[in-house]
């Protein structure tokens, strides 16, 4: 199991770790301050490559990460988080994205169920439309980008009502 970054740790002289905000099979996600752009919060996705991989496969995995990061950094759509940087430290790769405030759809569904309420049809249709727009945009890229992990926990709803499709860990380009 990889060692978690410590709160206050600074990566690349630019990103100060605040706390861990997510964890999955591919790695961890941290909330960080961008020290170069005062007041900007970002999400750092950390991917640690399997140490047991032969050197040639480890190199291929890193090259694939860098290719995908380059493609994701070129994306510009209101329903996708903006990728602003990527870098490697040791066997760990990092993808820097805009931090998306708000709750994920799974959390909203659980909260509504606990209260015995339903999500509003108008809101759900708006969210579905925004997700569709993001997917159409991704699929129209050259080469097409396939998210491959659409689920409520990967759909963030910002306080302003904007939907962001997050977690490109299983993306296929």
Name every feature range the model reports, one short phrase each:
Residues 86:
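Activation-segment/catalytic-loop signature of the eukaryotic protein kinase fold
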Residues 132-145:
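Protein kinase catalytic-loop region centered on the HRD/HxD motif
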Residues 33-42:
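Conserved N-lobe loop of protein kinases adjacent to the ATP-binding glycine-rich P-loop
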Residues 127-128:
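Activation segment signature within eukaryotic-like protein kinase domains
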Residues 48-74:
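AlphaC helix of the eukaryotic protein kinase fold
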Residues 18-25, 29:
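Protein kinase glycine-rich loop
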Residues 90-104, 108:
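Conserved short submotifs of the Hanks-type protein kinase catalytic core
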């Amino acid at each position: 199991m990889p060692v978690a970054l410590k709160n206050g740790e600074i990566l690349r002289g630019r990103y100060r770790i605040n706390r861990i905000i997510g964890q999955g099979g591919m790695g961890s996600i941290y909330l960080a301050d961008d020290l170069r752009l005062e007041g900007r919060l970002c999400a750092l996705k950390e991917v640690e490559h399997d140490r047991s991989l032969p050197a040639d496969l480890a190199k291929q995995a890193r090259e694939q990460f860098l290719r995908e990061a380059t493609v994701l950094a070129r994306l510009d759509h209101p329903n996708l988080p903006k990728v602003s940087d990527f870098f490697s430290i040791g066997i760990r790769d990092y993808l820097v994205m805009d931090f998306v405030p708000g709750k994920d759809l799974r959390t909203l569904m659980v909260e509504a169920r606990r209260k015995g309420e339903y999500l509003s049809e108008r809101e759900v249709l708006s969210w579905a439309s925004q997700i569709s727009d993001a997917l159409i945009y991704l699929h129209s890229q050259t080469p097409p980008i396939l998210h491959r992990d659409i689920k409520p926990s990967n759909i963030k709803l910002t306080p302003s009502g904007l939907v962001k499709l997050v977690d490109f860990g299983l993306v296929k380009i």
